[in-house]
Amino acid sequence: MAVKISGVLKDGTGKPVQNCTIQLKARRNSTTVVVNTVGSENPDEAGRYSMDVEYGQYSVILQVDGFPPSHAGTITVYEDSQPGTLNDFLCAMTEDDARPEVLRRLELMVEEVARNASVVAQSTADAKKSAGDASASAAQVAALVTDATDSARAASTSAGQAASSAQEASSGAEAASAKATEAEKSAAAAESSKNAAATSAGAAKTSETNAAASQQSAATSASTAATKASEAATSARDAVASKEAAKSSETNASSSAGRAASSATAAENSARAAKTSETNARSSETAAERSASAAADAKTAAAGSASTASTKATEAAGSAVSASQSKSAAEAAAIRAKNSAKRAEDIASAVALEDADTTRKGIVQLSSATNSTSETLAATPKAVKVVMDETNRKAPLDSPALTGTPTAPTALRGTNNTQIANTAFVLAAIADVIDASPDALNTLNELAAALGNDPDFATTMTNALAGKQPKNATLTALAGLSTAKNKLPYFAENDAASLTELTQVGRDILAKNSVADVLEYLGAGENSAFPAGAPIPWPSDIVPSGYVLMQGQAFDKSAYPKLAVAYPSGVLPDMRGWTIKGKPASGRAVLSQEQDGIKSHTHSASASGTDLGTKTTSSFDYGTKTTGSFDYGTKSTNNTGAHAHSLSGSTGAAGAHAHTSGLRMNSSGWSQYGTATITGSLSTVKGTSTQGIAYLSKTDSQGSHSHSLSGTAVSAGAHAHTVGIGAHQHPVVIGAHAHSFSIGSHGHTITVNAAGNAENTVKNIAFNYIVRLA
């Protein structure tokens, strides 16, 4: 079941804290609450709050608008916690308050040692793993070294094979040298083949030299694979040269056989020797090529083995570094663990790690027992609470008055000491005394029993008789009434009693303690003129008891429930400067405000028209006035007048003409007949007698034509005029005259100035509005 925490949140000046949120953040798990969950409560404007909090431990955080959150403290709610304020729970003792500081420090040291031990264990595991990795890397390196050794052996074997190939090439060279010697002898036998034999001998010598160089190169390649391959290639090239030289020797020998038959046999032998030398050279070349290939393969294999070995060596170095780092980390963790253990030992030695008692410090165990007599156990807050609850039920020492019905154990009969005697013991003792009286006194016992064992029987009887009413007519009248339910006796006349109905209203009025209460019940009391919540005009700034000014302030709805019915919001209206208006039939809600204003209306304004008639100004003769003299000189007009004419139409037809031939063939041949006018298209001209008649002709008339005209003629006609304006004056006659002007009917703009107060008011007297608290 949840525990109610309620109260008023106040600041240091006692004022309620407004706009604040109370947050409860769970610090640990409980049966109903999960750790780190947050609950919140928003106090009202008066700072009041109320929360039903589940069992658990919470951090209290205050969040005020406009300020950062603040941690107010920690509260613990137990299953048997009593309702209270937040301050009560914040100020209550917690388990941490009852725990010694040295114990908390020791717990922290133990936690740190445990953490360091975990780190050491992890570091140890890492170190073992790194050592295993290093061992594996070492094995891989060893395997790579073995591979490199095998590769070196293979390279050495290849070098030996290359050396054998070189030796074979050398043998071939020696054979070639021998054949060259034979060729030299053959050359000596035939003088005609001397030069050829000498050339063959030189070539053989060169082959021998090259073979020796090839042998030396092959020997060198045994130590360096790359050099061996290069020199083997050189040997191959030299062998090819030897082959070419042998071919040349064969050619020269053949030439010698052609020149000298005697040397044919020698040349043939020389050719066979050269052929043998060529075969040997080819064998040497093939062997050299195989040696070069084997050397190149050995070089590649060696390079691969070296690269693999380098990679594995790098990996081994990295593993070694990792192992070194893991070892360093493990050593550092071990040192920290050792230091933590040392600190724990120091603290343990400081407190002796012994149980504390009343004479020495040490470790104590918590206990919730309330009946223990141990001096080595520490009481928990729960035990303290149980004792305090029990103590609160006891009477204080300075107030011996007891409440309720105290009890005490009943002592045995005959007990005679300072033990408290209860009523049972006293009653038994009295009975024993009575039973122990002589038989002669038994009559008193019987009389006392008959009188109810009242020791003050005489006084009781006297007092009872004194309280009796003497018998008279009034009592007789009352005794004669018949009793009935809800009847009230009254006297109609002297010694004459009657009954009347007693209603609930009558009983209520009779139950009142004062006249004011009766008037209040009847609705005629001092505070009954106005119902709770009605605004009352009050002619003073001093408010009567039971009333409050209406100034927009909040009130306690629980303390004044009737006032809360009128104002459910818990806030009174601010009536300062406001009047009360009856709520219209529609459009307004109760307690709604309406700003000041005037009813919308219009004004009519006009100005009467007035005809001012025709007015005449006064007459005045200005006489004759002369203007001032000024010579304007000679002025030229602007150059203008230029214009052009548009042309359109056509020219007259002209150009028609004809051509005369002037020559004509007559009967006696061509002759010149001079010039004559031809009136038609054909004319005859008579010449001399010897010339005969000549005929002249002309062409028909052709060539008559006309031209069309269009366009604009050239602009012309621009000219200017020179105008002379000499010095002169103009007389101006201004005679006596008057001016008339008409002012017709017209209107004027009228401005109406503002008037009135700052707000709409009527004649009034200022009162305070108060309201009755109820």
Swiss-Prot record:
Main location: virion
InterPro entries: CarboxyPept-like_regulatory (IPR008969), Phage_lambda_Stf-r1 (IPR005003), Phage_lambda_Stf-r2 (IPR005068), Phage_tail_collar_dom (IPR011083), Phage_tail_collar_dom_sf (IPR037053), Phage_Tail_Fiber_Structural (IPR051934), Stf-like_N (IPR013609)
Intracellular or extracellular location(s): Virion
Segment forming the signal sequence: none
Biased composition (Low complexity): 248-274, 281-295
An MF annotation (GO) of this entry: structural molecule activity
Sequence ranges of Polar residues compositional bias: 603-615
Keyword Signal included in the entry's annotation: no
GO biological process: adhesion receptor-mediated virion attachment to host cell; receptor-mediated virion attachment to host cell; symbiont entry into host cell; virion attachment to host cell
GO cellular component: virus tail, fiber
Region (Disordered): 159-178, 240-295, 589-615
Pfam families reported for this sequence: Collar, Phage_fiber, Phage_fiber_2, phage_tail_N
Alphabetized UniProt keyword annotations: Host-virus interaction, Late protein, Viral attachment to host adhesion receptor, Viral attachment to host cell, Viral tail fiber protein, Viral tail protein, Virion, Virus entry into host cell
Functional description taken from the UniProt entry: Forms tail fibers that play a role in primary attachment of virion to host receptors. Assembles with Tail fiber assembly protein to form fibers attached to virion tail tip. Fibers are about 35nm long and have a thin, uniform diameter. There are presumaby six fibers per virion. They bind in a reversible manner to host molecules, attaching transiently the virion to the host until tail tip interacts with LamB and injects viral DNA into the cell.
PANTHER family given in the database record: PROPHAGE SIDE TAIL FIBER PROTEIN HOMOLOG STFQ-RELATED
Family named by the database record: Belongs to the tail fiber family.
Subunit structure comment from the entry: Interacts with Tail fiber assembly protein.
Name assigned to this protein: Tail fiber protein
Species this protein is from: Escherichia phage lambda
